[in-house]
Structures are given as C-alpha cells and as structure tokens.
A protein has these predicted regions:
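C-terminal alpha-helical interaction appendages
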Residues: 1-68
Length: 68
C-alpha cells in the first residue's frame, strides 16, 4: 500500500525520522512498491529499499536520526 502523505507512514517513522527523511522513505517506498508489484514480498522489499535510502542520507546516533 503506497503512502500518500507522511501522515500515512508508520508511527515509528513519523515520530523518530526527520521530515526530510520521511519524504525520502515515502517516495522510495512508493517507487519500490511499483517496481516489485509482481513479487509476493512486495511490501517487505519496499520497506527495505526505503530504509536503505534513508540511511544513505541520515545516520542514527543514539536515538536521533541526523544528516550524514
């Protein structure tokens, strides 16, 4: 299920990832969702791809996500 806005993201992402990181996650997830439409693991793959995109721009220091 694609996310239309950042408000639709899982609460753990909304509460811990900066807004720009949420944008990256949402856009990447939605793109991967379309790319893997025929894969039975579509949602799992889309989440992994989206997290990888966030981790290219941000890193987690303690409990905070900060720009690299």
């Amino acid at each position: 299920m694609p996310y239309l806005t950042n408000d639709d993201l899982p609460i753990s992402i909304r509460h811990h990832v900066p807004e720009h990181g949420q944008d990256i996650f949402r856009q990447t997830f939605n793109h991967a969702w379309q790319q893997y439409a025929d894969d039975p693991r579509q949602e799992e793959i889309a989440h992994r791809v989206a997290w990888a995109a966030v981790k290219r721009v941000y890193e987690k220091l303690g409990t905070e996500w900060v720009p690299r």
